[in-house]
């Protein structure tokens, strides 16, 4: 866990492997960076020595084909209302989903900040 000094932050579980953190925009990138760094430091410990040496795991995919898979990573989307108004939770959720998908396309753990004004 990341130690968080701001008692006004809210951390919640949306479902599956999705979580939400509500924080001040000014702290969001610093907090996301700390989460990414902490996650990437601990993730290799979930794997055996051989997998860590290789840098990936070998396993079967959903079609029973043997594949190489990267280690776990974390993708964070930062949604805020500093550049445009947000009208509903559904809008926040949709933007968050878009950002998370974009962050997952990167090779390693990452975060993306919504910078759109429309």
Regions found by a protein language model. Give the residues of each.
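Regulatory helix in c-di-GMP signaling enzymes, encompassing the GGDEF I-site helix
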Residues: 35, 93-99, 103
């Amino acid at each position: 866990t990341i130690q968080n000094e701001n008692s006004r932050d809210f951390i919640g579980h949306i479902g599956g492997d999705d979580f939400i953190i509500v924080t001040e925009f000014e702290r969001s990138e610093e907090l996301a960076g700390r989460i990414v760094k902490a996650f990437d430091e601990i993730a290799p410990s979930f794997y055996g020595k051989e997998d860590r040496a290789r840098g990936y795991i070998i396993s079967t995919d959903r079609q029973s084909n043997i594949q190489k898979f990267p280690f776990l990573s974390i993708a964070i989307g930062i949604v805020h209302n500093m550049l445009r108004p947000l009208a509903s939770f559904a809008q926040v959720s949709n933007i968050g989903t878009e950002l998370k998908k974009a962050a997952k396309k990167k090779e390693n753990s990452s975060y993306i900040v919504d910078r759109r004004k429309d």
